[in-house]
């Protein structure tokens, strides 16, 4: 179902965010994009 797809995307996004968070300034960039 659609919910399963959303959960899968959320997991992938979480992994990407964790990888980016290890880079300097990446967290700041993500915060700017979310606003």
Curated annotation (Swiss-Prot):
Tissue specificity annotation: Expressed by the venom gland.
Secreted found in the keyword field: yes
Any one annotated GO CC term: extracellular region
Protein name (Swiss-Prot/TrEMBL): Cupiennin-2d
Family: Belongs to the cationic peptide 04 (cupiennin) family. 02 subfamily.
Listed transmembrane segments: none
Keywords, comma-separated and alphabetical: Amidation, Secreted, Toxin
Organism (species): Cupiennius salei
GO molecular function: toxin activity
Subcellular location field: Secreted
Disulfide bonds: none
Record PTM Glutamine amide, positions in chain: 35
Domain of life: Eukaryota
């Amino acid at each position: 179902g659609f919910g399963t797809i959303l959960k899968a995307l959320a997991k992938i996004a979480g992994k990407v965010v964790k990888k980016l968070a290890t880079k300097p300034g990446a967290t700041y960039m993500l915060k700017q994009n979310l606003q």
